[in-house]
Amino acid sequence: MDIKQRFLNYATIYTGSSEGSSVTPSTKEQFNLAHELEQEMNEIGLSDVLVDENCYVYGFLPATKGYENCKHIGFIAHLDIVSDFGTREIKPQVVKDYNGNAISLGTSGRFLDTEQFPHLKNALGKTIITTDGNTVLGADDKAGIAEIMTMCSELIEKQIPHGKISICFTPDEEIGHGAALLDLDKFDADYAFTVDGSSPGEI
């Protein structure tokens, strides 16, 4: 499965979080994506894959031979999306070979153009995935999840040497609780990167 198909699959699974909830995760729907990722991580070949009672998803890539003493790196992304716009039926729209014109968002009457979003100018000729205008897309942060999952798949399939890698997908980041119950002893990384950016090339 390529990164685009992964993202499209994840985007259609509704995972809105709920402000003011007293439990974690704040919505049970986040478990739907968590268990989907759990299954895929096992299929890819990650080890010690786990979804805990608070909807934190863990998985690990052991170091390849000769790289056991490298620093232990972690990658984190979040399962939830904002829940204050539109319905739960998220319908991604794929625009191939972008030509620079305004992109109509389905039949919603909304559109994206380079005046509002100047970085679209850097996407000429590329494939762009948008919402249909009736919901959020959820690229924050399902794009990050797709990137991390594809990285893991590529490292395993292409037998690319690497040190030990920890993966964690967290719930409730959009309401400020993403790292609240992350088990640092289990995650056990020397350094970690949160994959949750904006424009291409941003660090």
Label for each model-derived stretch:
Residues 1-127:
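Acidic/His- and Gly-rich active-site-bordering loop/insert found
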Residues 121-203:
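Acidic/histidine-rich catalytic neighborhood of metal-dependent amide-processing enzymes
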